[in-house]
């Protein structure tokens, strides 16, 4: 079936899911149906949205209480013909959820693209396998850390932070998403200084680290800024996708003059996906759509930290990023926020080896600094892969980390 199928979670105070579904299908396509002359119906039939599935769900009293009324809940699926929209995300999202998103009681759970439609999207340029090949790391999760406290600091401070994190065994260091173009640490200077530091660490310690630099600026300047970054030697671009739009991400990915991986940050996405009643589902927004548009990495709140996402949601995001699809490479999951070494066994148990463990305070807050923090994480990763409990590991940096943040994983089994 060509076109796209949208799955919605609806809350209906008229208690007629069939009628509500049909209203949506008609309202987002031809506008009306039953009052049209037969000849016009025949002409418009190929453009009409069609309800293909309705599933009633159990009533939930806490939702009724929140809404201040009794509602029927249900999942509905509607097919939208490809004749109705151009094969791009702005058209697809407007068709399936444009004015409907203003309802306030409908959540877009999923979009199922036809094979023909999938061909219009690039998917990740590198994907999990390509990123692993860049780092020459095949047998373990990747470790990522974050520059902290860079606003108002100079290049010397950045170089010191970067060096310590790289020596600690971190695979990727990323800019803070709130670090924009500025006179103290301008984009090109960050890239050039970063390359100098990371090359020195590689020559001395034999460990390769990549630097994800924040791509910022006005939308019409982004491509030029990205190309300047590439010429300067950037390894990875960090991109605040939802501040700009998914289509902007796709445009960057499809540009052959920007041949480096792109890491999608979830900033602003909470405004679209946090509610259980309306907006986008997290697996759709932070999983499927980011992968289709071309993100090599997707950051999202972990189920364990201080900005936690429900575990089921986080795992569904990962499934959308990594499920087999011969049209698209797999994207790296990056569960983030509040991660310390004691959580490593949880992460590997829940997400497997094809994951990026992302830590900020869990590395910089270590008593031996970022070097000690990185080494603690690497020791935790190695021990977990060997099936060894963290409290039995004879590594001083990991021991210190567990004393500070605890070891909630002492009973976790892979």
Swiss-Prot record:
Family: Belongs to the RuBisCO large chain family. Type IV subfamily.
Binding site for Mg(2+): 174, 176-177
GO biological process, one term: L-methionine salvage from methylthioadenosine
Protein EC: 5.3.2.5
Listed PANTHER family: RIBULOSE BISPHOSPHATE CARBOXYLASE, RIBULOSE BISPHOSPHATE CARBOXYLASE LARGE CHAIN
Cofactor entry: Mg(2+)
Taxonomic path: Bacteria, Bacillati, Bacillota, Bacilli, Bacillales
GO molecular function, one term: ribulose-bisphosphate carboxylase activity
Superkingdom as given in the UniProt entry: Bacteria
Catalytic reaction annotation: 5-methylsulfanyl-2,3-dioxopentyl phosphate = 2-hydroxy-5-methylsulfanyl-3-oxopent-1-enyl phosphate
N6-carboxylysine: residues carrying this PTM: 174
CDD domains attached to this UniProt entry: RLP_DK-MTP-1-P-enolase (cd08209)
Function: Catalyzes the enolization of 2,3-diketo-5-methylthiopentyl-1-phosphate (DK-MTP-1-P) into 2-hydroxy-3-keto-5-methylthiopentenyl-1-phosphate (HK-MTPenyl-1-P).
Residues forming the catalytic site: 99
Annotated SUPFAM superfamilies: RuBisCo, C-terminal domain (SSF51649), RuBisCO, large subunit, small (N-terminal) domain (SSF54966)
Cofactor, free-text remark: Binds 1 Mg(2+) ion per subunit.
Protein name: 2,3-diketo-5-methylthiopentyl-1-phosphate enolase
HAMAP family hit by this protein: Salvage_MtnW
Signal peptide residue numbers: none
Keyword Isomerase in annotation: yes
Pathway: Amino-acid biosynthesis; L-methionine biosynthesis via salvage pathway; L-methionine from S-methyl-5-thio-alpha-D-ribose 1-phosphate: step 3/6
Complex formation: Homodimer.
Entry-linked NCBIfam families: PRK09549.1, salvage_mtnW
Remaining remarks: Has no RuBP-carboxylation activity.
């Amino acid at each position: 079936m060509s076109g796209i199928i949208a799955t919605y979670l609806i809350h209906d105070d008229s208690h007629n899911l069939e009628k509500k579904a049909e209203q949506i299908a008609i309202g987002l396509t031809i506008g009306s149906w039953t009052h049209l002359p037969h000849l016009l119906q025949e002409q418009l039939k190929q453009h009409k949205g069609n309800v293909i599935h309705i599933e009633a769900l159990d009533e939930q009293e806490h939702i009724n209480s929140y809404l201040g009324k009794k509602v029927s809940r249900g999942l509905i699926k509607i097919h939208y013909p490809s004749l109705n929209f151009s094969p791009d995300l702005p058209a697809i999202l407007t068709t399936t959820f444009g004015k409907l998103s203003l309802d306030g009681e409908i959540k877009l759970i999923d979009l199922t693209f036809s094979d023909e439609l999938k061909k219009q999207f690039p998917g990740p340029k590198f994907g999990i396998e390509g990123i692993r090949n860049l780092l020459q790391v095949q047998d373990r999760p990747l470790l990522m850390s974050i520059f902290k406290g860079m606003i108002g600091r100079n290049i010397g401070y950045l170089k010191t932070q970067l060096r310590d994190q790289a020596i600690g065994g971190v695979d990727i260091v990323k800019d803070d998403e709130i670090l924009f173009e500025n006179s103290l640490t301008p984009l090109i200077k960050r890239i050039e200084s970063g390359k100098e530091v990371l090359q020195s660490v590689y020559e001395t310690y034999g460990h390769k680290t990549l630097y994800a630099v924040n791509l910022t600026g006005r939308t019409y300047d982004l491509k030029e800024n990205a190309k300047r970054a590439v010429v300067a030697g950037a390894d990875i671009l960090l991109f605040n996708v939802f501040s700009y739009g998914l289509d902007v991400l796709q445009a960057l990915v499809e540009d052959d003059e920007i041949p480096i991986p792109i890491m999608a940050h979830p900033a602003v996405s909470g405004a679209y996906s946090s509610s259980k009643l309306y907006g986008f589902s997290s697996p759709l927004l932070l999983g499927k759509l980011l992968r289709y548009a071309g993100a090599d990495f997707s950051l999202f709140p972990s189920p364990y930290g201080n900005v936690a996402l429900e575990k089921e949601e986080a795992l569904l995001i990962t499934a959308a990023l990594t499920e087999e699809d011969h049209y698209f490479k797999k994207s790296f999951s990056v569960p983030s926020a509040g991660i310390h070494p004691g959580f490593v066994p949880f992460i590997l148990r829940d997400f497997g080896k094809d994951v990026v463990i992302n830590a900020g305070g869990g590395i910089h807050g270590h008593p031996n600094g970022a070097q000690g923090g990185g080494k603690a994480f690497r020791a935790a990763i190695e021990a977990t892969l060997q099936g060894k409990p963290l409290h039995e590991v004879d590594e001083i940096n990991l021991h210190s980390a567990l004393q500070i943040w605890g070891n909630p994983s002492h009973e976790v089994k892979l």
